[in-house]
């Protein structure tokens, strides 16, 4: 189980310095946190000069603390007219402050500085501050040009699980004598695996143990004058005297032309369009229907919420990461003027038995889930909130709800602006890569419909076929929805899920569903499906009577989910199955990082019923992989959804030839 997050306690010394009672050490120099950040970390890493004329620049910090190093770096980036296009700041923190404590600490520090541009940034940071849950949290500022990737957890555990290429290291944290683990050889070896060949570092300490650990990990150091009269601090470069890593950190996809094809204009594809366009890519979106979001993404509404499991398994962690990331992306779209229809009053998940409710309640307590993510609801509380009878209690997801998938897809395409070209009513039959390295999307006649440096297949169950994948087992699952006329179902004020779901729509109409019918290809709504949905609704909300309505007279809709055999999505760079077959004998014990890849070919499919939760995170992962940016989730989670995972399993069992 993932360790729960224990927040930091905010304490000020008499001189105004923020201090940690847990570690018995100060968060910053009494001479000034922001001035220290500038002298030690910014100037110590040769910034801002080193990020100039770079498309993207990545900094890793080993302790976020009060956020002053990030705030000072952000302000320096803003003040530099020649700054890099995109600044990535990745920071690890075992004990993050709660939002309002962070606001107080940073505001207090800023109040004693003459660096005036920083003051407005404090509220921006605090307002974006995430729920204190383990894992990776990505925040964007300045229209996405500045990205803060927070990693909540023990650095010893999380640093080896990051995927990125670092250009500078801010080695901060409590003194080695107070928190020796953060300065251990294991930490520096993890950092060395993430370092760009030109990476630099800076730290306020000149401890002998730190110097030895740096040297062992391949970092060359030198002493320079410290901050505020301190005799010495350390700066240096990554300069290994030997080969220190089996796998190089990720690089950007190399191309002179930043154009891409996305096949499939549902939730998966439109999310990718928006993320690539935000990075300056010109995208051609190809959809076989006459309009976007016409298939499963064309449902009147979909629900969104994280999954919670007592053991905090991979699926639960992925859903939590996807849910929180989606909320951030949707808010950014709304701030940019690309509004779409979604509920904002929460979502209730009801248990199907008293025993299940007890397990749900215990899971919340055991995991330390913050109330802003989920809280337990007794049966009486659920009755009062939903204004109708329920059989059992459950969970309240305060930020969950329902959304119009088609409206979201339209907002994402609108955000792409003139970087998006659409081709509709055309079905792609296959892909081929030319001698010039560019991909061509061909129709059934062999005509080239579009060509680009990069292709993302996001067309659900057809993706594997178009990409020529033999080792990507997916299945179509029929899902029938039922629309209930006004007044025919309990008027719940917010979406309710459990065994099925009920969503209040406009004009008093209620949406309920959905059936789960593997390998059924009938696209016509059936009376039996409506009857099944009505019976499920009756179990969910006992005040409803399934026999009160004529199932044969109801309206509905059929969509088809695409589900992988392990129920996780397929997201990221695709494996080169032909190359793997040629090298099969050498790859029997391969890991995912050893598998040959289809250069410039990516996938975003197999989202099943969780497209709203997973699509935004999947799109961000693909965009980060293409542009060589820090990944927005742990490598362990990225590998769990790597499309090549099935190829690796086949190689291990000798099934690739």
Curated annotation (Swiss-Prot):
Organism ancestry: Bacteria, Pseudomonadati, Pseudomonadota, Betaproteobacteria, Burkholderiales
Organism: Burkholderia pseudomallei (strain 668)
PANTHER family: SARCOSINE DEHYDROGENASE-RELATED (PTHR13847), TRNA 5-METHYLAMINOMETHYL-2-THIOURIDINE BIOSYNTHESIS BIFUNCTIONAL PROTEIN MNMC (PTHR13847:SF283)
UniProt-recorded name of the protein: tRNA 5-methylaminomethyl-2-thiouridine biosynthesis bifunctional protein MnmC
Renumbered residue ranges of the record's region tRNA (mnm(5)s(2)U34)-methyltransferase: 1-239
UniProt main location, coarse: cytoplasm
EC number: 2.1.1.61, 1.5.-.-
Disulfide bonds: none
NCBIfam families to which the protein is assigned, alphabetical: MnmC_Cterm (TIGR03197), PRK01747.1-2 (NF002481), PRK01747.1-4 (NF002483), tRNA_MNMC2 (NF033855)
GN (gene name): mnmC
Subcellular location as annotated: Cytoplasm
Location of region: FAD-dependent cmnm(5)s(2)U34 oxidoreductase: 263-657
Gene3D superfamilies, alphabetized: D-Amino Acid Oxidase, subunit A, domain 2, FAD/NAD(P)-binding domain, Vaccinia Virus protein VP39
């Amino acid at each position: 189980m993932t360790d729960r997050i224990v927040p930091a306690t905010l304490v000020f010394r008499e001189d105004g310095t923020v201090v940690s009672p847990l570690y018995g050490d100060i968060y910053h120099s009494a001479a000034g946190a922001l001035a220290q950040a500038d002298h030690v970390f910014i100037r110590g890493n040769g910034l801002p000069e080193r990020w100039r004329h770079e498309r993207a620049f990545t900094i890793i910090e080993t302790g976020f603390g009060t956020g002053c190093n990030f705030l000072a770096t952000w302000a320096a980036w803003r003040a530099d007219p020649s700054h890099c296009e995109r600044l990535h700041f990745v920071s690890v923190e075992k004990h993050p402050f709660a939002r309002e404590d962070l606001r107080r600490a940073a505001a207090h520090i800023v109040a004693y500085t003459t660096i005036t541009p920083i003051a407005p940034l404090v509220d921006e940071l605090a307002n974006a501050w995430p729920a204190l849950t383990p894992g990776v949290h990505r925040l964007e500022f300045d229209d996405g040009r500045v990205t803060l990737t927070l990693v909540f957890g023990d650095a010893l555990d999380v640093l080896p699980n990051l995927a990125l290429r670092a250009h500078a290291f801010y080695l901060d944290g409590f003194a080695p004598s107070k928190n020796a683990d953060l300065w251990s050889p294991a930490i520096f070896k993890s950092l060395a695996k993430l370092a760009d060949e030109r990476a630099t570092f800076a730290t306020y300490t000149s401890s002998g143990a730190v110097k030895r650990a740096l040297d062992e990990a391949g970092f060359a150091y030198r002493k320079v004058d410290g901050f505020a009269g301190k005799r010495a601090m350390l700066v240096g470069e990554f300069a290994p005297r030997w080969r220190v890593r089996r796998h190089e950190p990720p690089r950007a996809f190399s191309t002179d032309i930043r154009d891409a094809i996305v096949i499939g204009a549902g939730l998966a594809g439109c999310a990718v369009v928006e993320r690539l366009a935000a990075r300056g890519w010109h995208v051609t979106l190809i959809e076989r229907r006459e309009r976007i979001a016409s298939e499963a993404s064309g449902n009147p509404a979909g629900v969104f919420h994280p999954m919670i499991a007592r053991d905090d398994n991979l699926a639960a962690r992925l859903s939590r990461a996807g849910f929180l990331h989606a909320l951030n992306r949707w808010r950014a779209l709304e701030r940019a003027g690309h509004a779409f229809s979604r509920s904002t009053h929460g979502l209730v998940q009801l248990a199907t038995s008293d025993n299940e409710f007890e397990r749900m309640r215990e899971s919340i307590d055991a995991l330390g889930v913050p109330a802003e993510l989920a809280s337990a609801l007794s049966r009486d509380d659920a009755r009062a909130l939903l204004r109708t009878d329920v059989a059992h209690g459950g969970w309240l997801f305060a930020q969950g709800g329902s959304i119009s998938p088609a409206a979201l897809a339209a907002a994402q395409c609108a955000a792409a602006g003139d970087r998006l070209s659409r081709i509709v009513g055309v079905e792609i039959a296959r892909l081929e890569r030319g001698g010039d390295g560019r991909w061509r999307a061909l129709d059934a006649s062999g005509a080239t419909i579009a060509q680009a440096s990069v292709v993302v297949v996001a067309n659900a169950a057809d993706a594997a076929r178009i990409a020529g994948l033999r080792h990507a087992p997916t299945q179509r699952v029929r899902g029938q929805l039922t629309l209930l006329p006004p007044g025919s179902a309990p008027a719940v004020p917010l979406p309710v899920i459990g065994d099925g779901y009920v969503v209040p729509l406009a004009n008093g109409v209620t949406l309920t569903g959905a059936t789960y019918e593997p390998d059924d290809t009938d696209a016509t709504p059936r009376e039996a499906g409506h009857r099944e949905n009505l019976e499920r609704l009756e179990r969910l909300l006992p005040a409803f009577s399934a026999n009160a309505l004529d199932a044969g007279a109801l309206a509905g809709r059929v969509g088809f989910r695409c589900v992988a055999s392990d129920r996780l999505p397929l997201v990221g760079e695709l494996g080169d199955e032909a190359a793997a077959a040629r090298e099969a004998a050498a790859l029997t014990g391969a890991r995912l990082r050893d598998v040959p890849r289809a250069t410039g070919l990516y996938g975003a499919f197999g989202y099943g019923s969780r497209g709203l939760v997973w699509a935004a995170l999947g799109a961000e992962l693909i965009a980060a992989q293409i542009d060589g940016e820090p990944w927005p989730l742990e490598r362990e989670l990225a590998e769990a959804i790597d499309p090549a995972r099935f190829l690796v399993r086949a190689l291990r069992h000798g099934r690739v030839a």
